[in-house]
């Protein structure tokens, strides 16, 4: 099973988000894909963010690096499932403050 982890940031916080992203790239295996900064809300995601995509075998490592580097930002971790609403809600885990998702965009 594959997962996404989304680290959210305020539009005014782009520089710190970029630094956190670089930390993720340097501390995680190349098999963990770290996407670019997305500077707007997209789909159900309510704030700018960047996304990691990884296999289940990297779950513990990704979570540990996120906990160490997120600097108080909210992180949504969810499996990739056919039922996207369930993936983003009942099967999701938050690090930090949970944010209201725009589930009507799924």
In which residue ranges do the predicted regions lie?
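Short, low-order "capping/linker" segments at domain edges
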Residues: 45-54, 58, 85-106
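Short, intrinsically disordered low-complexity segments
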Residues: 27-74
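C-terminal structural segments of small proteins and small subunits
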Residues: 76-77, 85
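Short, surface-exposed beta-strand/loop "edge" segments at domain boundaries and coil↔beta transitions
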Residues: 14-16, 60-62, 83-86
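Short, extreme N-terminal segment that most often corresponds to the first beta-strand
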Residues: 1-23
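Positively charged, polar, low-complexity stretches
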Residues: 18, 22-36, 99-100, 105
